[in-house]
Amino acid sequence: NKSKKRRNRVSFLGAATVEPPKPIPLTWKTEKPVWVNQWPLPKQKLEALHLLANEQLEKGHIEPSFSPWNSPVFVIQKKSGKWRMLTDLRAVNAVNAVIQPMGPLQPGLPSLAMIPKDWPLIIIDLKDCFFTIPLAEQDCEKFAFTIPAINNKEPATRFQWKVLPQGMLNSPTICQTFVGRALQPVREKFSDCYIIHYIDDILCAAEMKDKLIDCYTFLQAEVANAGLAIASDKIQTSTPFHYLEMQIENRKIKPPKIEIRKDTLKTLNDFQKLLGDINWIRPTLGIPTYAMSNLFSILRGDSDLNSKRMLTPEATKEIKLVEEKIQSAQINRIDPLAPLQLLIFATAHSPTGIIIQNTDLVEWSFLPHSTVKTFTLYLDQMATLIGQTRLRIIKLCGNDPDKIVVPLTKEQVRQAFINSGAWQIGLANFVGIIDNHYPKTKIFQFLKMTTWILPKITRREPLENALTVFTDGSSNGKAAYTGPKERVIKTQYQSAQRAELVAVITVLQDFDQPINIISDSAYVVQATRDVETALIKYSMDDQLNQLFNLLQQTVRKRNFPFYITHIRAHTNLPGPLTKANEQADLLVSSALIKAQELHALTHVNVAGLKNKFDVTWKQAKDIVQHCTQCQVLHLPTQEAGVNPRGLCPNALWQMDVTHVSSFGRLSYIHVTVDTYSHFIWATCQTGESTSHVKKHLLSCFAVMGVPEKIKTDNGPGYCSKAFQKFLSQWKISHTTGIPYNSQGQAIVERTNRTLKTQLVKQKEGGDSKECTTPQMQLNLALYTLNFLNIYRNQTTTSAEQHLTGKKNSPHEGKLIWWKDNKNKTWEIGKVITWGRGFACVSPGENQLPVWIPTRHLKFYNEPIGDAKKSTSAETETPQSSTVDSQDEQNGDVRRTDEVAIHQESRAADLGTTKEADAVSYKISREHKGDTNPREYAACGLDDCINGGKSPYACRSSCS
């Protein structure tokens, strides 16, 4: 025997001796001594330390020292009352500064299930293994320590270790090496025995008991030759055996019967240790990952080991499950002649693997609770678990499993090999059987399964005959989609990707039919493709967790399939896809966002949005149509009519009092509207007496200026002498309408309704929660109506018209035919001003202007030779289109406001008076600042050769 020859030598007396084992030297990164002062020790502990040191000195484990190195030493008392000496080697163990680590020789515990079943066992424990292994002579001084003297009354005593000190970084590795060398001859001679060695614990198994005894006898001799000793009181020869804290029976392996203390679980470190211990025995217990999710969740958050943690009720239930499994769980010792198989179960959260032999459970296999990737497909998890467990089986027995059983059909397995890189890696070089038939046993029935293994709703190819929807998101928090319909969603996120994720979720919720989704975010596309069957990695970002979970729930709840793909944004490529994506991008542009925000605050109308922001008519209409308040309050409009109007700002006002009950004491709303510009001013009052009217008018003067004329109803506050005196002081003329007939006040009556509607919109559907008082609410409504809204046939706001006198009608100054209802004839005139449903016409030089409905107007578009015939409806038919059709020809398709100020009742057309006409004519001439008669020449030409002196001469000459 070569090994025996190496160990045995012949002395000069002729007797055989045993050569002592050769020490293993340590590698040091520095030769600079490390000295850590010894701290003072109590008298009792100091006495115990002296006794222990003398004992170790007698055994030859330590020796006196004068080393420049020093490590503190201390003692602890065991439950038995005996003392134990320990050395604080933390400074010496500093990996990056002092000592070179050797690395572990046994990185994991051996599986006891690999011990052949029914084989007899012997288990031994080496006594004081570290103290029987010598240190290299040059390393001894590095492990010196000092025993101090009380009050320094005598010199301290110093020693250094000659054997492996407990607590040294490389002591376990050196111990494993020494014991392994001692056992090598045993393994070589008894190769058919099964021997497990871990640190200083040794297990021997043999098929026959006689063989086991022979192996044990030889092992005793080899251990003694190596200078090691067996603890005689720890030899086990009968069941149940206890090894590596597990209980071994003839065919079963059971975990230790322990109870988990919950009262000590207070910090992250406590829970980390607990879960580390549970994970150590999970391959035996068989607790799936999903059954410990709440315990794993406690580890999230602050990484400080002392940070506080609390045991939740759900986690308490999971600890109880662990305790129950500890009491009942068991695995089986194997038959060395039978192959192993791997079963993959599609459990919730992540798949579970089981190593079996026939129907006997050998070991459980699980994936970590947390993954590296944000989304991990379930199929990829299965592939990872297969690869992981295959390596485990090869490590246990040296062979691949004979069969792998998966919850997939043959076609699904074939597709997995084609499409999944993870599947190809997990099953690389596997030559066994892939099956989907599970053994019939009750062992696995408690597992909670999932059906989300492969996608059911998500498609990898575009759907035919399906709607196509484009999505987009912006960093301003807006998400949108466009397709059969458009929608813009305001989100709380300041990330374009998260906003786009909201857009995709909204599309999946809004379209209950097959759809193709096109997004310009590759991140969102990939997430949506994978989320159906994916395990979502937990993130410290709660918002992101909520979004991903909502996306997964939305996809899984769908009844119809969808396909999603990526398109590059902001390219110059031609085609409908690029244009549609640009349209989706416009929906979340800053201009559109600002328009949405303004409408949410003020409920401005479509034309106002179009005028103020760079948005299309369709986008402006969509904003108003998607507003729930504006939809409810979109009232039908009446046919337009005519009330006398001013021809310039502050020429003619109408004034009235309306009521808003929600304003309480201030429910009397005094309203004034300028009939030229439609500028509105209103104040909240506690009544409608003359004093309240005067107070309101003074407020109007401060904002609008002083009018020339005011028209009111016949209320007491307007007919009093005090009010007449007030108007006289301000040089304002006053007229009233027909008693009990509101048609003469149609403009202000409609204004009342407009104002009330706007108040309701802003109160129930606006973002203006800071407007709490009645006057604040009223001011916001007035701001919207005056400075934001634009009405049909207008190009500017009421405020701009009032302040600048700018005209709105594109027809002003045009030559027209107008119908004289008294004479039933058509006359030629010139438009002074034009509104929706009304117009003011100048019949000719030195004639008062006439207010008429637009249905009595015709455009003059060709000359007529006979002047007398031209004025008769019987002799000449006007050759022109109607006003309404002309509006369309001029492209005036702007959407009217729901409650536009100028939509008065047509029944008020007859309210025109000669006095009003005269005033209007005067105002018009003064406002124009033009005394040249040519301004009102019948032909309408500024360079009329007749100077506009005679309409008939003008017609005959200019024609």
From Swiss-Prot:
Per the Swiss-Prot or TrEMBL annotation, the motif YXDD is positioned at 198-201
UniProt binding sites for Mg(2+) 1: 472, 500, 520
Residue stretches making up the RNase H type-1 domain: 463-593
Q: Which reaction does it catalyse?
A: DNA(n) + a 2'-deoxyribonucleoside 5'-triphosphate = DNA(n+1) + diphosphate; Endonucleolytic cleavage to 5'-phosphomonoester
EC number(s) reported in the record: 2.7.7.49, 3.1.26.4
Compositional bias per record (Polar residues), positions renumbered to this chain: 872-884
Q: Where is this region: Disordered?
A: 867-893
Q: Which InterPro entries match?
A: DNA/RNA_pol_sf (IPR043502), Integrase-like_N (IPR017856), Integrase_C_dom_sf_retrovir (IPR036862), Integrase_C_retrovir (IPR001037), Integrase_cat-core (IPR001584), Integrase_Zn-bd_dom_N (IPR003308), Rev_trsase/Diguanyl_cyclase (IPR043128), RNaseH-like_sf (IPR012337)
Binding residue positions for Zn(2+): 599, 603, 627, 630
Q: Does the keyword Metal-binding apply?
A: yes
Record domain Integrase catalytic: where? 645-806
The record, for SUPFAM superfamilies, names: DNA-binding domain of retroviral integrase (SSF50122), DNA/RNA polymerases (SSF56672), N-terminal Zn binding domain of HIV integrase (SSF46919), Ribonuclease H-like (SSF53098)
* Zinc finger residue ranges, Integrase-type: 590-631
- Extra information: Exact N-terminus of this protein has not been formally described.
Q: Which PANTHER family does the entry mention?
A: ENDOGENOUS RETROVIRUS GROUP K MEMBER 10 POL PROTEIN-RELATED, ENDOGENOUS RETROVIRUS GROUP K MEMBER POL PROTEIN
Tell me, in a sentence or two, what this protein's role is: Early post-infection, the reverse transcriptase converts the viral RNA genome into double-stranded viral DNA. The RNase H domain of the reverse transcriptase performs two functions. It degrades the RNA template and specifically removes the RNA primer from the RNA/DNA hybrid. Following nuclear import, the integrase catalyzes the insertion of the linear, double-stranded viral DNA into the host cell chromosome. Endogenous Pol proteins may have kept, lost or modified their original function during evolution.
What is the recorded name of this protein? Answer: Endogenous retrovirus group K member 19 Pol protein
Q: What is the lineage of its organism?
A: Eukaryota, Metazoa, Chordata, Craniata, Vertebrata
In the UniProt record, the gene name given for this protein reads ERVK-19
